[in-house]
């Protein structure tokens, strides 16, 4: 059977949307016991994870990676990521090892493969051999083209696509062992890998198709038919008073999945049908014809898509009732409620479904200890035990491809956490190539001649990762969150447990709180609920650990601030009275965390209530159990005694907080 190809044209009659109303109800359920799901991969122990990680990325041989060698190699890994070099498997080290990343080994700041391989020409060809079912081919083509442009914008390299024959860079998707001796590992973990420039497999780039490939912000679903043909689903969307985060068949009697292409379907009425095998197939040789169920394959009748007869795990179906006779087939779309992992081969969720006697009409984490959202792929999990993980934000194909193509140009991994070539995946909404990346690639190929001739885009310096002891940094926010002190500057953070110790970092904010904008104005922790509250512009975000609370961000007005307050300077929860203080300009407000509203009698002037505290603050923090509050502005801070409100110290942030 031929390899996965681009989707064919969609055929089949247009079916009108027939709204029947919401009939589903969710049964409230007590907390479920933790169970073992069939087909679930057991998580590795910390030691198993460390040995595999250090073997793969730092060359520690599995058979001789004993405690002594392990400790030394761990220190190398910790140094690479800016972690305390303890040589121990502490929590921060394990957290870093469990993050999704590239499959190539690590080195240091922009670096090159051994012997610095590079292309000996500037005209580079690429060919897309296969596609992921997660995105339509046009979106995949565009993501790869934009990823190559990241590098052509700053070098003389020019990339052109060919559709036949051998290209310099062959691009494909695969699962587990996929023919190059470097297997992938299922969902999450290793995302992709690429080979250094050269002949044969040189430059080839492979992407793990057990991942959910998106543009970084959830499923990208292009609808067919309806009254919004070719537009994209809007998730979540509102229908009959309920929000939907994926395609649904609610309101239909034919089982076809649909979505709204605007948030409010009831207001706008814009919709289309989501990819589904009953509407169309892609690739294959059936020119987009829908599946025909049941169909016969090798003498067996199939009532749904299958992976039988294939070694790559892709779901397919016959488009006539007898594949053995007609040899007509197509691949089943996997962008509409398709599951990832589990034991259902990508089959879609079925709602409602029964689990341990309770009904669920949406994805749930019930029964799991890792908090991952899942669903059943039949109406009754208890009977059938068929399930899969629900789609999440997925991984940006553009960002991962831009990183891998950096390897295909000759760059290794960078130790700079702000660089595209850093090994750990972090979604960045408004991506810009960093100075570290530009310096590395231009050392190999030089600068783009278009810039010198004035025919290219106006050059702009890429962002530089700040160094807290070498620069005078004014922090955007400082807060104690879950017992650690965090310093925020643009898209970076530094963290420490104790003041005066040099903070660990820089790290990317998006690694911990991915939905935040690239720059915040203020942050504090509400200790009563252990939730972190972030402010940026006229909005605020609330997180439980790294999970954004539903419905956020919200406008500052919903917190009780007046409409003319378009940003805040600082905020902190005061241990003296458990109230939260919000500062903007020369005023401050007091918020009651218990009653969830502003206290009356505010705002007040900072100068009238706080001894020696200036206006336009940068940050405020009250360290737990310390009895003092700290007010930051510019390069200095004021330390106030909480009971007397007396200023007891004026000091330097660098020397007293950053260990410089």
UniProtKB/Swiss-Prot annotation:
Glycans are attached at residues 573, 642. Ca(2+) 4 binds at residues 476, 521, 569, 618. Phosphorylation on multiple sites modulates enzymatic activity. Phosphorylated by PKC in vitro. Ca(2+) 3 binds at residues 185-186, 208, 211. Its cofactor is Ca(2+); Zn(2+). Binds 4 Ca(2+) ions per subunit. Binds 2 Zn(2+) ions per subunit. Ca(2+) 1 binds at residues 134, 209, 211. Ca(2+) 2 binds at residues 168, 200, 202, 204. Disulfide bonds join 233-259, 247-274, 291-317, 305-332, 349-375, 363-390, 469-660. Pfam families: fn2, Hemopexin, Peptidase_M10. Residues 228-276, 286-334, 344-392 form the Fibronectin type-II domain. It is an enzyme of class 3 (hydrolase). Inhibited by histatin-3 1/24 (histatin-5). Residues 30-109 form a propeptide. Hemopexin repeats lie at residues 472-516, 517-563, 565-613, 614-660. GO terms for molecular function: endopeptidase activity; fibronectin binding; metalloendopeptidase activity; metallopeptidase activity; serine-type endopeptidase activity; zinc ion binding. Keywords: Angiogenesis, Autocatalytic cleavage, Calcium, Collagen degradation, Cytoplasm, Disease variant, Disulfide bond, Extracellular matrix, Glycoprotein, Hydrolase, Membrane, Metal-binding, Metalloprotease, Mitochondrion, Nucleus, Phosphoprotein, Protease, Repeat, Secreted, Signal, Zinc, Zymogen. Changing residue 498 to M: In a colorectal cancer sample; somatic mutation. The keyword Chloroplast does not apply. PANTHER family: 72 KDA TYPE IV COLLAGENASE (PTHR10201:SF29), MATRIX METALLOPROTEINASE (PTHR10201). It is linked to Multicentric osteolysis, nodulosis, and arthropathy: An autosomal recessive syndrome characterized by severe multicentric osteolysis with predominant involvement of the hands and feet. Additional features include coarse face, corneal opacities, patches of thickened, hyperpigmented skin, hypertrichosis and gum hypertrophy. The conserved cysteine present in the cysteine-switch motif binds the catalytic zinc ion, thus inhibiting the enzyme. The dissociation of the cysteine from the zinc ion upon the activation-peptide release activates the enzyme. This is 72 kDa type IV collagenase. It comes from Homo sapiens (Human). The gene is MMP2.
């Amino acid at each position: 059977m031929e390899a996965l190809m681009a989707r064919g044209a969609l055929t089949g009659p247009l079916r009108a949307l027939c709204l029947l109303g919401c009939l589903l109800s969710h049964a409230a359920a007590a907390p479920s016991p933790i169970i073992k799901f069939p087909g679930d991969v057991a998580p590795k122990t910390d030691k198993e994870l460390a040995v595999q990680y250090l073997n793969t990325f730092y060359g520690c041989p599995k058979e001789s990676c004993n405690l002594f060698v392990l400790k030394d190699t761990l220190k190398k890994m910790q140094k690479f990521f800016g972690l305390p070099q303890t040589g121990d498997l502490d929590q921060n080290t394990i957290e870093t090892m469990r993050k999704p990343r590239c499959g190539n080994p690590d080195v240091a700041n922009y670096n090159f493969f051994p012997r610095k391989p590079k292309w000996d020409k500037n005209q580079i060809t690429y060919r897309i051999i296969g596609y992921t079912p997660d995105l339509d081919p046009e979106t995949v083509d565009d993501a790869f083209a934009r990823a190559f442009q990241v590098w052509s914008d700053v070098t003389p390299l020019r990339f052109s696509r060919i559709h036949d024959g051998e290209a310099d860079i062959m691009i494909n998707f695969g699962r587990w062992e996929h023919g190059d001796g470097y297997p992938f590992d299922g969902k999450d973990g290793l995302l992709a890998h690429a080979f250094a420039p050269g002949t044969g497999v040189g430059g080839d780039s492979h992407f793990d198709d057990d991942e959910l490939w998106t543009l970084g912000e959830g499923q990208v679903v292009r609808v067919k038919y309806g009254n919004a043909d070719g537009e994209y689903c809007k998730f979540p969307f509102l229908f009959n008073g309920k929000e939907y985060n994926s395609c649904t068949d609610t309101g239909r009697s034919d089982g076809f999945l649909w979505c709204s292409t605007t948030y409010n379907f009831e207001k706008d009425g814009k919709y289309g049908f989501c990819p589904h095998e009953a509407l169309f197939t892609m690739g294959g040789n059936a020119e987009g014809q829908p599946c025909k169920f049941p169909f016969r394959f090798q003498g067996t009748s199939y009532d749904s898509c299958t992976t039988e007869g294939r070694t790559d795990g892709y779901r397919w179906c016959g488009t006539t009732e007898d594949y053995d006779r007609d040899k007509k087939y197509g691949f089943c779309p996997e962008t509409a409620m398709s599951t990832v992992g589990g034991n259902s081969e990508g089959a879609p969720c079925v709602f409602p479904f029964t689990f341990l006697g309770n009904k669920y009409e949406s994805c749930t984490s019930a029964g799991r200890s890792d908090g991952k959202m899942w669903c059943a792929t039949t109406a009754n999990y208890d009977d059938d035990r068929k399930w899969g993980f629900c789609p999440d934000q997925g991984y940006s194909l553009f960002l991962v491809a831009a990183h891998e193509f950096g390897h295909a140009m000759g760059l290794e991994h960078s130790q700079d956490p702000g660089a595209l070539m850093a090994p750990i995946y972090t979604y960045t909404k408004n991506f810009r190539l960093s100075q570290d990346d530009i310096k590395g690639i231009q050392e190999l190929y030089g600068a783009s001649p278009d810039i010198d001739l004035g025919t290219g885009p106006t050059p702009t310096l890429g962002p530089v990762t700040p160094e807290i002891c070498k620069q005078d940094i004014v922090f955007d926010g400082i807060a104690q969150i879950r017992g650690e002190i965090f310093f925020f500057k643009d898209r970076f953070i530094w963290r420490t447990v104790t003041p005066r110790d040099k903070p660990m970092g820089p790290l990317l904010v998006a690694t911990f709180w991915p939905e935040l904008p690239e720059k915040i104005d203020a942050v504090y922790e509400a200790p009563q609920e252990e939730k972190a509250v972030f402010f940026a512009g006229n909005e605020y975000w609330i997180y439980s650990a790294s999970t954004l609370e539903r419905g956020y961000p919200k406008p500052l007005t919903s917190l009780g601030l007046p409409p003319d307050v378009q940003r805040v300077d600082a905020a902190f929860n005061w241990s003296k009275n458990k109230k939260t203080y919000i500062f903007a300009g020369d005023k401050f407000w007091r918020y009651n965390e218990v009653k969830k509203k502003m206290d009356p009698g505010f705002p007040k002037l900072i100068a009238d209530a706080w001894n020696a505290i200036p206006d336009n603050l940068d940050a405020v923090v009250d360290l737990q159990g310390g009895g003092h509050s700290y007010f930051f502005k510019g390069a200095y801070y004021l330390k106030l005694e909480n009971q007397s409100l007396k200023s007891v110290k004026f000091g330097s942030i660098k020397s007293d907080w950053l260990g410089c």
